[in-house]
Amino acid sequence: KKDAKWSNGDEVTAQDFVTSFEHEVDPTSKSQIASDFKYFKNYNAVQSGKMKPSALGVKALSEKKLQITLSKRQPWLNDILASKGYPINTAAFKKYGSKYGTSSAKTVTNGAYKLVNWNGTSDDWEYVKNTHYWDAKNVKINKVAVQVVKEPGTAQNLFTSGKVQETALSGTY
């Protein structure tokens, strides 16, 4: 998308998708979705460690143009790209390395919201409107507070009292 930007103001580029795909397929990342990209050229060699992730069949042809080379036809490629083909902010990923995404301070997003007030282990955090989002003017909710509640009784009480708008309840409640 031409106007897509990261929450830090950087433009989303084709290289951000390359970085993401290479990271997902890199065996050291232990990604649970790596096999979704098994039809990308050199997937098996990269997954087995015989080739570097940079040998994967993805290449940024320009700032906004991405080339994906497949080892064989994949009829559901569009579905996979729409649901699993998320970019990673390349500059932030290089800066934070394995710590990227481990806290809100080390996470850069490109959606309607950015993650704040999460330290990587806390049970609550917030999503605040991303002012750099391409369609920010149509994002009507400025902040979403998330709280993980581990006890079903507590969740039910919070919901009943109106302190939370949504919760998962067990059959007991």
Q: Where on the chain are the PLM-derived regions?
A:
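Aromatic- and charge-enriched surface segment that lines or borders ligand/interaction sites
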Residues: K1-I33, Q67, S161
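Surface-exposed binding/hinge segments that line
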Residues: D16-V18, I33-A91
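Ligand-site clamp/hinge motif
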Residues: H132-Y173
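Gly/Pro-rich hinge or "lid" segments in bacterial periplasmic/extracellular proteins
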Residues: L70-V139, K143
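Solvent-exposed coil/turn segments that connect beta secondary-structure elements
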Residues: D3, F17, E22, E63-K64, ...
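Second-shell loop/turn segments in exported
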Residues: K2-N8, S54-L56, V144-A145
